[in-house]
């Protein structure tokens, strides 16, 4: 599907970018693809990636999604875009909400506008469960990013740039997530700091995150939002699973929720569930293609309306201790940390 095509990954030196490149480099995709452009701000991470991967099809572009000119110039000749650049730390965004807006909303606007201007065929925008019923600045900014993508999709004609969204739950062992924190605390013989033991989170691997984006890329229609069905766990069970894996007797210390945290996360709202397509391992939330001429809808109505529960980390499949251990032991990150323990 990428034969002789040019792909851009914004925020490409982050966890998602590394996971995509790892997948591509282990398959025939890299042989078929024309070029992969990594667009990000950090020249040190780009240099590290350039040396580590040493692949002539990788091209590196220094720039910031906040700067339209830099992203527009880098996108010349690009066929597809995976937009992963974001501010995603919830407490940080609570203290600096305008920074979240500048990157997650205005930056996304720049990426989408540049893609349309450069006649990119398809853009996949990466979002988060925190965009559903948002209570924090990060979630609010991502919700607005989704609205931007869908609004622009609604205005596209047949044959123009296709804009789709993917929503993630908690991506295990991604940068800034709780699993690296717990492992570091175990190695340093410190207490494992748990915010709220009964708090639940979806558990997705980086492999799952790539699967979701590639599924959306292959099946996405204009304005679609895609969600992968995922299991969940309480934070306490996750911490205990890591204790057992690493043979740790560290104490668990409960510290209370951080700024902007929710007790559980939702991947699909109840309103969206009423209209979502169940695709087996995924949900597709189609774009509402109606226009602002509401008079005709007073007569036609909306056919697909129902009262359904939202899809959240409390009502999805809940993993027990042994199931969480099995999931964790399949992660490359955990395997590497065990070797170095």
From Swiss-Prot:
Enzyme Commission no: 5.1.3.2
Gene3D superfamilies: NAD(P)-binding Rossmann-like Domain (3.40.50.720)
Catalytic activity: UDP-alpha-D-glucose = UDP-alpha-D-galactose
UniProt-listed InterPro entries: CapD_C, NAD(P)-bd_dom_sf, Polysac_CapD-like, Polysaccharide_Synthase-Rel
Pfam families: Polysacc_syn_2C, Polysacc_synt_2
Record carries keyword Isomerase: yes
Keywords assigned by UniProt, alphabetized: Isomerase, Lipopolysaccharide biosynthesis
Keyword Isomerase: yes
Any single GO BP term: lipopolysaccharide biosynthetic process
Molecular-function annotations in GO: UDP-glucose 4-epimerase activity
Functional note: Epimerizes UDP-galactose to UDP-glucose.
Family according to the record: Belongs to the polysaccharide synthase family.
The protein's name in its UniProt record: UDP-glucose 4-epimerase
Taxonomic lineage: Bacteria, Pseudomonadati, Pseudomonadota, Alphaproteobacteria, Rickettsiales
